[in-house]
Every structure is written in C-alpha cells, then in structure tokens.
Amino acid sequence: MNDTASEKVKNEIKESINILDEQDAHPRRPRSKYAGEMIQMDASSFHWIEGEVWHLHVAIDDADGKVVGAYFDRQETLKGYYEVLYQILINHGIPAMFYTDRRTVFEYKRKDRSSDAEDTFTQFSYACHNLGIEIKTTSVPQAKGRVERLNQTLQSRLPVELRHAHITNIEDANVFLNSYIKKYNNQFALRLNSTKSVYEKQPSMEKINRTLAILSTRTIDSGHCIRFDNKYYFPVTENGDGRYFAVKD
C-alpha cells in the first residue's frame, strides 16, 4: 500500500469514529474504596404489581454494591427516603455521603410546595446535615450508574418475585422487601473486608427519631396553643405540666 492510499485509509478511520468532547464523555468511575464512603440513592416508578404503579426508593453502597435500603411508596416522597435512611442507620450506621440526582435530592426549599411534609428539599437536607452526611448531586444519570443499573435489575426481577409471593398491596410488598434484599445481596454484593468501612457508629434511637422528623414552624397564639393540620396543641413539659409562653405583639 502506497503512502497516499495509507493516508486515505487513516482519514476514513478517523471519520468513522465519533470522538466525544471531554465534557460530554462519562467514563466508568471506579468503585469507592470503603463501605459507607458513597451511597447512591434514587427512586424508580414502575408497575411492580399488576395494575399498580409504585415508587421504589433504593440506596446502594458504591463500594460493594450492597443494597442498604429499599422502600415502596405511591409517590417519590420524603417518607420514602426517610425510611431508606432509617434502614441504613439501623443496619449499618451513618454513611459519609449520599450521591443522587438533582431532581430527587433535597437541598433547597421549593416555592411550589406549601406543605412542610411535601417540602422534601429542606427536610431531608437538614436531617443529613444533623447527622454529618454530605449530599452530592448530579444531573447526569450515567454518573450514578450503580443505582441506575440496580433499578433496571429490580424492575426485571422483583415483579416476578412479588407475583410468586402473592403480594397484592404495598404494605405486604414492603415487608417482603426485607427478605428479598437479603437474598439479593447474598447473590450480587461483593464480599469486602468488614474493616474497610467508614460508616460511623449508629446513633441512638432517640436521635434517629428526632432527626427523621418533619419540622414545621408554628406560632404560639394568645391561648398559648399552636395550630397544626387544623388541630390545636397545648405545649407541656416532660413532666406533663403546662408550658406558657409570652406572646409577641
């Protein structure tokens, strides 16, 4: 082959290869080194049982691929993510970081949500802040590929398992998840040395309950009560004695 022909072949090869710009490329990222270093979190909407569309909230450890939390709800909700975080705290401890989609991580108060219970952006972020958990977000699905692949795997496998177990409602489905996730981890999670973990010690149940709460600002009225969900509450001390506050003008 002469030089002219050789150069022509090289040019044809270059033209046939679509080279991406660096900013558009999403190369495979190596796993985290330690368990608890990064937890990828997401929710997926799917027909998990016939005639029902639920949202499965899941969390997977980036280091070993272990599913560390899973919970069904009818929508993508604060409760769903709180339930997942509760499972992580109880079974593993406090992770270092959550990595999730900007649409589903809860960092900023949404102006279109009037209810405190719906304001997941403020509530979840505040809970993580109190526990010392960093929240990192991305708008690129490929960046959190492990949880995306987990969603795909569960969508192909879990409906079959739910049908075989004769699950017909969301309450029983959440109970079933406990045994199913253990089975899934035994089959797919990597076996890492247990010392390679950065999970912090599990907080007390009192701290967990106080942290995974819906916080709401209310004003004491002239009758020394607060109003919440159209009900009035009278503040008391730990001993049950009435607590009175001066009302600001």
Cite the ranges covered by each PLM segment.
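C-terminal, beta-rich DNA-binding module of retroviral/retroelements integrases
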Residues: 19, 181-249
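Alpha-helix N-cap and loop-to-helix initiation/capping positions
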Residues: 76, 115-119
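Acidic/histidine-rich, metal-coordinating catalytic segments
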Residues: 89-116, 141, 197
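Charged alpha-helix within mobile-element recombinases
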Residues: 117, 123-193, 199-210
